[in-house]
């Protein structure tokens, strides 16, 4: 995909940690480009998706060190490959946001043991046992990684 669209792909989230559950966890990727429209068209063609599958969104990054909230505009889609049990969440941003977004993602690469353990416990409840609905799973996961661990509230 990277060769086709002519842009590097950056992985983040659980795919880079031990709380990734193959075939169950989604894979999060970021793509940074100077020309979002062209990149989105290439992704649509490569993934055989419609333009309407890509939604514009606002990503808010709160930085405690300088108390400035950064608002980033991007595009997001979810690609599902049922044949390979693969779900990929793709975000496309303008190149000017690359540094701030990658720094925010890097803050969640090396989580403390207690956070990782709790995330794995949540995933077992959600993926394996099916007793934790997606809404509560997502909410609790966001609270744990954003409020209890690092100082970002994105």
Features from the language model and the residues they span:
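Catalytic core of pol beta-like nucleotidyltransferases
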Residues: 1-2, 16-24, 33-154
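Acidic Asp/Glu-based divalent-cation binding sites
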Residues: 26-28
